[in-house]
Amino acid sequence: NETVRRFLPMVDFLEQILGKNSEIVLHDFSDPDHAIVDIRNGIVSGRKVGGPATDLALKIMHDAKYRDLPFITGYEGRGAGGKTLESATYFIREDKEIVGMLCVNTDLSTVRSINARHSLFDAAPTRTEPAPIEVESLSESTQELIDRSIAELLSARGLDVASLGQSDRVDVIRHLNGNGVFMLKGAVACAATALGISEPSVYRYLQKVRKEG
């Protein structure tokens, strides 16, 4: 997408300003499976060019409530090895449609001095509303994204995969569908693997969920 590519110089610009502890990522929504078109300091999250869209990116593509927001700041990201990141995202638009994102994810765990801790994120006194999600998972693959999403959902409900009944599995598929996960190629197979069920079962549950509207 040419509109997204116009932001390529901003990736270099932000890298020079923010330094090695901040990952800068440019996403193009025209190909969610390979949404990352440029990245600097990818070691922060373990990602690289050609990586898939995050759970937050999928939610933004899927959820109309983000259409009027220019950006979101002050939310938590989860990077490589489970490290906690301070994150911010600027939405790239064509007319009113969000076609990409420019994201900054800062690893505060490596900051040594008190002065260095006062990053540009400190300028935002509150999190942008509406809050996107509790934590954005910066996953390297579709399987990892789905595994994390399911694990977090089940943990919150005090469940595990082995104990799930059919209605529970339908709820999991409903959750994934609501977050736009099935926009990713191969997501059905990944969900089947994560839940220990067949792909036809996932398709059946997905059809049921989508019929519900």
State each model region's role.
Residues 1-8, 15-17, 100-101, 106-166:
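Juxtadomain coupling helices with adjacent low-complexity linkers
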Residues 11-73, 78-80:
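Structured interaction and signal-relay segments at domain junctions
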Residues 37, 90, 180:
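Flexible, active-site-adjacent loop/turn segments at secondary-structure boundaries
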Residues 60-121:
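Sensory/regulatory domains in signal-transduction proteins
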Residues 165-213:
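Phosphate-/nucleic-acid-contacting segments
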